[in-house]
């Protein structure tokens, strides 16, 4: 890891986001444990690499509305454990909301940030991932997102 960081530094390249996209809401205990453990390792690696943020989504598959409800408490548990580790290591982490995942919309995203209440938790904002209905008033839609969570991007 140290050599990777050094090679980037020699080329004056700053690693902005270390992507570690894991299945954090999966109800399968073994899958979720592996996801949390892997993300924790990336948080630790980041102490060496020095990226601004270690980022993830909260699932892999496209989930139905019912599946998102089932996966939600598992996601919350995983995120809480990761935020605790990020705080312990003094490293920032970020979540990326995706319409098809348990972290699916503004309401759920606000809930996560309020419950976690950590300066170490940030947000990756890819508008295409949260736009369910493109025919809506996008100006109002994005304004709502940015007013609620713009300081977390």
List the model feature ranges, each with a label.
Residues 21:
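Active-site-adjacent segment of FAD-dependent monooxygenases/related oxidoreductases
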Residues 135-153:
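Glycoside hydrolase catalytic-domain groove-lining segments
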Residues 18:
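Zn-dependent metallopeptidase/amidohydrolase metal-coordination segment
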Residues 2, 7-14, 24-125, 132:
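Active-site acidic/histidine proton-transfer and metal-coordination neighborhood
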